[in-house]
Amino acid sequence: MAPATRSLLRAPLLLLLLLLATSRLATGAPVANELRCQCLQTMTGVHLKNIQSLKVTPPGPHCTQTEVIATLKNGQEACLNPEAPMVQKIVQKMLKSGIRK
């Protein structure tokens, strides 16, 4: 192939790749969601009977704080304050009963 033809074929290919890369951002899809804390605000407690599962994320490179995320029976997720005595009791009860995600 001639060099001029080759560069004419490259331009549409590069444009297509650029469009594909930006379309993911345009749809609002999360990009690298795990690279930051998930809990921006926390609650001091929630009633144990409303919790379906519990996820405890230790501190790491993504977030310097321990995060406790409760999935409620109505499907909502709630960030709980891991320092709150009520939350610590909930975590201990869930660990003992084995209902941990």
From Swiss-Prot:
GO cellular component: extracellular space
Record-linked InterPro entries: Chemokine_b/g/d (IPR039809), Chemokine_CXC (IPR001089), Chemokine_CXC_CS (IPR018048), Chemokine_IL8-like_dom (IPR001811), CXC_Chemokine_domain (IPR033899), Interleukin_8-like_sf (IPR036048)
PROSITE patterns: SMALL_CYTOKINES_CXC
SUPFAM superfamilies the UniProt entry points to: Interleukin 8-like chemokines (SSF54117)
Signal peptide stretch: 1-28
Function comment: Has chemotactic activity for neutrophils.
Name of the protein in its database record: Growth-regulated alpha protein
